[in-house]
Amino acid sequence: MVLVRVLANLLMLQLSYAQKSSELIIGGDECNINEHRFLVALYTFRSRRFHCSGTLINEEWVLSAARCDRKNIRIQLGMHSTNVINEDVQTRVPKEKFFCLSSKTYTKWNKDIMLIRLKKPVNNSTHIAPVSLPSNPPSLGSVCRVMGWGTISATKETHPDVPYCANINILDYSVCRAAYARLPATSRTLCAGILEGGKDSCLTDSGGPLICNGQFQGIVSWGGHPCGQPRKPGLYTKVFDHLDWIKSIIAGNKDATCPP
C-alpha cells in the first residue's frame, strides 16, 4: 500500500508539472485547411523565410502591419503546409504599398497598418479567397480567431510548417492599459487575448488577421514578451476604424488620410 501511495503521489507531481509546462506553449491547434483561404505569408526574395502574415481583402489588395514592410516583399497565397505545396498556390509582388504614416514612424499603439496593391490580381480557388471587411466593430467579449505561422513556443522560436489557430476574446482596452504602462488613454487598437494566459499571437504572426464572426476585425500588431503571459493580452490594429481610408485608397484616392 505504501508503494502504491508513493507511485500515486509521483504521478500527481508529474501531472502537475506537465500542466505548468503546457502553460508556456502558445495555445492553439493546426488550422483547418479550409478556414484560412484569405491568409497570406510575407517573405523577402533574399531570405525566403516568412517574417509576417497578411490578409487578402479582394483579388488585388492585401492588408498587413506597417512593421512588416520590407524591400523585395513576396506574398504567397493559398498555402497551408510549407512542406506540401497546394496546386493552387500563387505568389505575387507589390505594385504599390500604402501607409497611414511612413512605415518608419508608426507607433506600437497607432497606425500599424499597411495596404498592399498586388502587381497582378489573384484568382479565387480551392485555397484562395478574400475575407469580409467588418460592418461593425467587434463586441466586448467576442470570441475571435487568430492565426498564422508564427512561433508556437513562448521560450524560443519554434515555427510550425502549418498555420496555427487559437480562439481569444475581445477585452476591454483598460486591460491592455494596465498591462502596458506607456499605452495612451485611447488608441485605434483592439485588446484581445485570454486573461489567464496560454493563448496568444507571437513572433512572426505580425500582420495576420483577427477574425470575429467571419469578419476581419484586427491586424496582429504587438504584445507581451514572452508571449501568452497572464494578463498580458495582444494589441491588434482596429480594421473598422480604418475602413474609410482603406476604401478610399482602393477607389483610387492615393492622398486619403487615416483617422487621427
From Swiss-Prot:
Any Pfam family: Trypsin
Disulphide bridges, residue numbers: 31-165, 52-68, 100-258, 144-212, 176-191, 202-227
GO cellular component: extracellular region; secretory granule
Propiece residues: 19-24
Enzyme active site: 112, 206
Domain of life according to the entry: Eukaryota
UniProt-listed SUPFAM superfamilies: Trypsin-like serine proteases (SSF50494)
Location(s) in or outside the cell: Secreted
SMART domains: Tryp_SPc
Keywords carried by this UniProt record: Disulfide bond, Glycoprotein, Hemostasis impairing toxin, Secreted, Serine protease homolog, Signal, Toxin
Signal sequence extent: 1-18
GO biological process, one term: proteolysis
Tissue: Expressed by the venom gland.
Residue runs in coiled coils: none
A GO term for molecular function: serine-type endopeptidase activity
Keyword Secreted: yes
Main location: secreted
Peptidase S1 domain sequence ranges: 25-251
Aminoacyl-tRNA synthetase among keywords: no
Glycosylation sites: 123-124
Misc. comment: Is devoid of arginine esterase, fibrinogenolytic and proteolytic activities.
Family the UniProt entry places it in: Belongs to the peptidase S1 family. Snake venom subfamily.
Function description: Snake venom serine protease homolog. May act in the hemostasis system of the prey.
Annotated protein name in UniProt: Snake venom serine protease homolog
Organism: Protobothrops jerdonii (Jerdon's pitviper)
